[in-house]
């Protein structure tokens, strides 16, 4: 999915226009998506695609909800993304599909706008039985979070998987282990690029920093 470092200047992306279409055209040529996914990607930077029968990826363009983006108005549904999201999840629910949700700037984190946080949380509540997991970036930190209602009932769960950017830490990434039948996440393994060893040996040195089942139990 599209991140805030994918544009220049950073964080800036206009609503559908000749400038945004230029970027989306490049992504169209780079990402291997189906025809319908490429169509919505070209228009608004968001898409959905089946990975296999009954297992769907839904990806949003969170740059439209970045409060550092000076080219957008916060209180409107830019590129009809929320309408598309609701329609997509409704169809997935009717078809009994499992949805993995991906985005860059998570609601109520980083630079997410209040408009995004409010509307997204309502959608998560509505489709909590369809969206199995959320996967986010942007924070440059390894973390996870839960969404709870006023009665402390959990209605959604999300992962933030670190960053390859070496800002005050080693570049890091994550590999997930999942059940192919249920699509449950069974474990994940977090890796880092050891820059100290890489510089010493002039070879990329990757080691496992931890795995979830051993660390969290």
Task: Please provide the spans of the model-predicted regions.
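Active-site neighborhood of phospho(di)ester-bond hydrolases with catalytic His/Asp-centered motifs
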Residues: 1-3, 100-104, 127-145, 158-162
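Divalent metal-coordination and catalytic microenvironments
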Residues: 3, 60, 85, 101, ...
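Active-site-proximal segments of metal-dependent phosphoesterases and phosphodiesterases across multiple
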Residues: 64-83, 90-136
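Metal-dependent phosphoesterase/phosphodiesterase active-site architecture
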Residues: 8, 16-91, 95, 141-217
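Core catalytic region of metal-dependent phosphoesterases/phosphodiesterases
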Residues: 1-15
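Short, electropositive alpha-helical surface patch
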Residues: 12-26, 112-125
